[in-house]
Amino acid sequence: VHQLPDITKFKDEWRSETKGIVLSSAERIMVKSMPGNAYRILAKDVRSYEFVIPYDEKADVGEIFTVEDRDMLFLARVVNVQHDSNYDGRWDTSIRGTELYDEEQIFNRVIAEPLGCIPRDQTKRRGAFRKAKTIPTKFSRVKRAEAEEFDFLKDTMGDIEVGVLRNGSRDTDVAVALHSSAMDHHMGIFATTGMGKSNFMKVFAASCMKLASENRSEFGLLIVDPHGEYLRGGKAGKGLLHLKPYLSSLKCYSTDPRNHSLPEVSELTISRRDILPEDIKVLHDWTGAQMDALESIERIFDGESWIDEILDENGKAMLTEKAKVSEKTVDVLVRKLENILSRNKYIKSSGSSSIPGIIEGVKSGKVVLIDIPNLSESSELFLLSLISRRIMEDYRNEDEGRKKCMVVIEEAQRVLGSDSRIARFEEIAREGRKFGVGLCAITQQPKLIDRELLSQFNTMVVMGLADRNDRMRVEESAKQDLSSLDVEIQTLEKGEAIISTLNVPFPIPAKIHRYEDYMERLRPSAPERRSFRPTPD
């Protein structure tokens, strides 16, 4: 039988170093017998750890602590912090002043989620992380995780750097990088307005450009930008054109005449012959009769010249007769088609098309940016749907020399919702990975995305969601358990993220690089570093 040490022996040490954080008389004696200012595991089970810290010290939600137990280090992530004490009842509202209670009897209780464990010996940590299947010994020492205790993560990170590991409110020097090999398994970026989605995408694209310039790219990235944020940037920052060392890995097309004088930018042109009747379905709410007429076009007219034919009087008559629809229906359809052509000046009746160059760019592993400011939402979706169709048609044919492809969709709930009229992106979500085509869905409202489609996404970047229904949809669809991180997701600040992907051992708290700072680091003259600590906004 172990004899408990005399409590008086440790009285002064206890008060000066731990401020008397206690629970019961037996635990009080045990804790006081352990020198140093580290804290101790007190409870609970394999799903949750609890320890206490002085009442005037802080522990952040999301902060990672380590628990030392013999030759192992257990890692645990804070999910909640509570005021607690050894007093009974509502003592804190029934007293006045500070003379009526003992500071050694009040403390903060920290509840932490176990993440896993690694060897204490640094030389044995490589590839040694594993899930914890037991609990640390009671009263094992607890301390805030140090930078070197995250070194094991470097071996699990990918090649597309996006930020650094964030431990609570502190940034570490461990780079956070996504995996090129996972990009055809789809990625979701979820955040409310102002949380840094556009900055994340510019950082992501910059890393892809760097890899392509070094001949290390595994996929091409297609971005259709309806807001003009990525090409030149804007008042608040810079764009991809400012990343001079890697412009050879960027192909730019624009509908904005102001950009056509730039040597790096080509005018976006789409030939009428590129368009199929199914492509224009997204541009209007068609009646049943008009939809029947559209679906009849492909069997009545030549596959590539149908637009020119239907605009001709003879073509209109042929469609009326063979599709068995009224002249009024055909007249309305033709007027809508003429309206589409007049509003989308990049659609040309003759001349070359940008689509072959776009497809060649993604197949060679480059970042292809299509800048379409001032176009309507329907025109944006039409263009993205058309290009995505052509990409899928190309990628269905085997080609060992090409790279995989990722298609970025802004406001993805418009095309991945259960009531969406656009089947093109649903097809990519369900079947794209078989052919090496992935989606990057950006949205503020993941709750509007079809559950089954969202479950196809293996990588999720969560940058703050205020709506509980949005968080629930992401949590139930993620490949890692995010349910315990609900409070942390609510408290994320601009530029902070939780990244969930099967290639890392647990959901990673990250600070995303500020694009303008990351640009400076990517300059060839900049000193080489394994990671980057971003300048706060």
Indicate where each model-derived feature is located.
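Glycine-rich phosphate-binding loop of nucleotide-binding enzymes
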Residues: 159-254, 418, 422-425, 451, ...
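P-loop NTPase motor domains
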Residues: 206, 228-239, 255-430, 434, ...
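Hydrophobic residues in beta-strands of the RecA-like P-loop NTPase core, especially within AAA+ ATPase
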Residues: 224, 409, 442-443
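Basic- and hydrophobic-enriched, low-structure N-terminal and domain-boundary segments
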Residues: 1-192, 199-200, 204-207, 211-215
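Conserved ATP-driven motor cores of ASCE-family P-loop NTPases powering translocation/secretion/packaging/pilus
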Residues: 429-511
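Short loop/turn elements that form and flank the Walker-type P-loop nucleotide-binding site
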Residues: 183-185, 215-218, 363-365, 400-403, ...
